[in-house]
Amino acid sequence: MKKPITLAAAAIVGALLAFILIPDNKSAPTFSLTDLHGQTVNNAGLQGKVTFINFWFPSCPGCVSEMPKVIKMANGYQGKDFQVLGIAEPIDPVESVHQYVKEYGLPFTVMYDEGGTVGKAFGTQVYPTSVLINKKGEVLKTFVGEPDFNKLYQEIDQELAK
């Protein structure tokens, strides 16, 4: 009896999150963060590129589980008008983020959202959460949990073809 109740509760939470997160085709929230190398990253860097923003942290099991696929995606779209941005949430200390990035050789820009303000602006409450943004800086889709990467690749390819 507990299993159907748990599944129903999960479905309700998922439905509520769909209303909390940024609606599709709205401009991405304004943000400015410093990456792990000291460079400023902000909304201006979204223009002209399809962007996948991944909100994560190193001790998050789901985040760690999907990270090899995010790395593969970043490598697979190198040289195209596509970028991955990793925004580490302040659940873990910044030192853990640096260690994880170094250990796994993340091939994309990673920032530490020290105050959690960017995650809040994007409506993240569950991790991992990822956002696909078009070349105009508009949110195309928000993924709570690991996305279906095959479908994600199709969406990226469609946007790159525009």
Regions found by a protein language model. Name each.
Residues 47-49, 79, 106-107, 124-125:
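Active-site acidic short loop of glycosyltransferases
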Residues 52-53, 84, 130:
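Hydrophobic beta-strand anchors of alpha/beta hydrolase catalytic cores
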Residues 31-51:
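A short beta-strand-turn-helix
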Residues 1-34, 162:
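N-terminal targeting signals for export/organelle localization
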Residues 99-106, 114-157:
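Thiol/disulfide oxidoreductase modules built on the thioredoxin-like
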Residues 49-51, 55-59, 126:
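Short pre-active-site segment immediately N-terminal to redox-active cysteine/selenocysteine motifs
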Residues 65-104, 114-120:
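Structural microenvironment flanking redox-active thiols in thiol-disulfide oxidoreductases
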